[in-house]
Amino acid sequence: MRALGAVVTLLLWGQLFAVELGNDATDIEDDSCPKPPEIANGYVEHLVRYRCRQFYKLQTEGDGIYTLNSEKQWVNPAAGDKLPKCEAVCGKPKHPVDQVQRIIGGSMDAKGSFPWQAKMISRHGLTTGATLISDQWLLTTAQNLFLNHSENATAKDIAPTLTLYVGKNQLVEIEKVVLHPERSVVDIGLIKLKQKVLVTEKVMPICLPSKDYVAPGRMGYVSGWGRNVNFRFTERLKYVMLPVADQEKCELHYEKSTVPEKKGAVSPVGVQPILNKHTFCAGLTKYEEDTCYGDAGSAFAVHDTEEDTWYAAGILSFDKSCAVAEYGVYVRATDLKDWVQETMAKN
């Protein structure tokens, strides 16, 4: 039996053993542990209880307790001989943001409040963002994936040109890239890792929402490795708190254009974002704090206080605002969830 993040607790002859799966310790003998005395009209039962390491949760049809039957099989009354699984916890950072702080002039993330934030280096060394959504998959933008590639490039062409880091500069290998089938209007792609990452306080996925957290005025946090006020890529992860903006005002600000990269007279940055039913805007007009080049692919993270869980309400697509264009543009996570789950299941 082997499972990432799993621990088995065994009660044998009255002695409790904790066995970490993967350590080749399936046979346990302890001569110093005597067999418990028999009792009238009773018997001794051998039990195992499956538990998970910190930052993992047990997924099982039963209670995780298995007994040894007459055929020498470990079985559970509800699950039979089907073993439980340890799944990665999402959206539960050990050191969540605890300040209302306003990644141009944003704050440094000294505590590891955004363990889902990944750094992706594209072809020719450009820094972009990606967001861990499971222990083996990340979301980023299709535009990030196509940086310095032609429009004719395929997912197989792109994957070998990317370098990806999670946690404190932990290099991870990429197995494949999957592009959204409507990437011209839904600026999203998925990255699958060759191996599952071990979830820790420094590396943890963020949850995808089942309900919509996007409403004007709703505050969210965006972290990133993008350019700073000096237009240089930051060496340390930074974050900023921004409100969801009124969609109509945002569209008016960008001349209501839905044509990507179309130059306009009003747009302060000379290009237009993709704006449609799959996107929302966030940003401030009175402060210097903002996302900037290189932050795309990062999550608009919101905290559900009732569940005490962090969700990715969106993924930053248009990161060229840089405290000049007022609004960054995000792809709605609720519009992605079905496609993401189907893609991960198929691959």
Swiss-Prot record:
GO CC annotations on file: blood microparticle; extracellular space; haptoglobin-hemoglobin complex
Domain Sushi: 31-88
Chain ranges passing through the membrane: none
Molecular function GO labels: antioxidant activity; hemoglobin binding; identical protein binding; serine-type endopeptidase activity
UniProt keyword list: Acute phase, Antibiotic, Antimicrobial, Antioxidant, Disulfide bond, Glycoprotein, Hemoglobin-binding, Immunity, Secreted, Serine protease homolog, Signal, Sushi
Tissue: Expressed by the liver and secreted in plasma.
Annotated protein name in UniProt: Haptoglobin
